[in-house]
Every structure is written in structure tokens, then in C-alpha cells.
Amino acid sequence: MYEVQLDKFQGPLELLYQLVKKNKIEISEISLARITEQYLEYIEHYRDFNLEMASEFMVIASELIELKVKSLLPDSEEDSTEEEKGKTIVQRLKDYHVFKKVTELFREYEKAAGQIYSKPVNLDKYVDNEVNYEIDIDISELVEAFKKAMSSTDGVEVFEGDRNLKKIESEEIKIQDKMDQILELFNQNPDQGLTFSQLVSGNPSKMEIVVTFLSILELTKLRKIEIKQEKLFSDINLRSKAG
């Protein structure tokens, strides 16, 4: 398991997630930007891409992102009942079960093809058909925008016989560079805002979307920008707080 080195914690990423979930460590004290920077440096140094470790990192990082978003946005669940909270917890456990199944699927492809996995993948057989998945309106729509952007990206396609395959490309994108890029866009057009879809347009890689998303959260935490949404499922609007 990949380990992180932070001011408030040193150890496995999964242990950090468990401590945050149990409120042993405040999510506000954790820098997701630094965690991602360390992970990118790690895979750059060791070159040998480990798909199992990468899939585990993405699952846990996604959970930490959701917790971070909830800590930044106003609490909309003040009047929620214990029953509603219980349903939310149960839904989280069901979602985690699906994530684990997907992770097992990636492990199978890692053994069969190293850095190459087949496209498309039918995950229907890994989902319990008796479970009624509903839209959780208590989850930040910012997370939904992130998931939508992640699902719309394509990688570098290669061909092996009649199989259409996708090859995982390693790249290095720094959080600070992306933050500077976003702020520069605001400096060029100080009276205009930006949207999340604009920042991830042009067929970016999944890694770039993750870094962009974390950069937005970090800029929000630093009070450099503010994020708003006009209505449910609409685009995420960003506006500079300079001046």
C-alpha cells in the first residue's frame, strides 16, 4: 500500500482514510494536493506502473475528495433524520462494494495484459441488480461534475488483432502549476467567470481532470475563488475573489 508523508500523518493512505472517517483526523488538516503531488512523484521515480496500487489510490482519493468537498460547502443536512442518515451510510457501503468489484476486475486485466486493459468493460454483472441506486441529493454536485468529466475522457488507443485496447499513459501534472494556470485565466478576464467544463475541455487525460479538480478545491480553501451552481445538475461556476 502506498504511504504518504504529511505534517499531521505519516503512513498508509488507507489508514489515513479510516482515521478521517472516524474523525480521528480533521479532513481540513489534510492537503489532498500534497498527497497527489507525492503520488505523482512516486510513480515518476519508480516507472514500473502498478495498476493495483493505482486503482486503490483512485478509490481512496475519490472518497477523501468527497469528504473534503463536504467540509468546504455549507451543511444542507441539518434537518435530516437519523433514518435518512442511516440510508446514506448503507448506500456508501453498497457503493464501496461496487468499487471493490471494479478493483478486482482491474487486477485480472493487470495479470493478463500488464499496462493494457480492454475497452469497453461491461460492469453490469458486478452490480447487484436487486439494489435500487438512487441519486443522493446530499452528495455535492461538484463531485458529480468530477465523475461526469472522468467518464467522458479517452486514452491512447492501440489495436491487437480484433481487440480495441486502451493503453495507460503516465504523465506529470503539478497541482501548483494547474492552480497558477486557473488564476492566470482569471487575471486575463477579471470580470468573467469560468466553468468546470471549460477547464476540462479539449479531451484531457483522467490525471489532468483529477489535478484540475484538486486545484479548484485548494483554491477554494485558500479563498482565491468561489464556486456556485445555479441549479441541480447544471455546470459548476467559478469566480475569482480577488479585489
UniProtKB/Swiss-Prot annotation:
Gene3D superfamilies: 6.10.250.2410, Structural maintenance of chromosome 1. Chain E (1.10.10.580). Pfam families: SMC_ScpA (PF02616). One of its GO terms (biological process) is cell division. It comes from Halothermothrix orenii (strain H 168 / OCM 544 / DSM 9562). Component of a cohesin-like complex composed of ScpA, ScpB and the Smc homodimer, in which ScpA and ScpB bind to the head domain of Smc. The presence of the three proteins is required for the association of the complex with DNA. Participates in chromosomal partition during cell division. May act via the formation of a condensin-like complex containing Smc and ScpB that pull DNA away from mid-cell into both cell halves. This is Segregation and condensation protein A. PANTHER family: SEGREGATION AND CONDENSATION PROTEIN A. It comes from the Bacteria. Keywords: Cell cycle, Cell division, Chromosome partition, Cytoplasm.
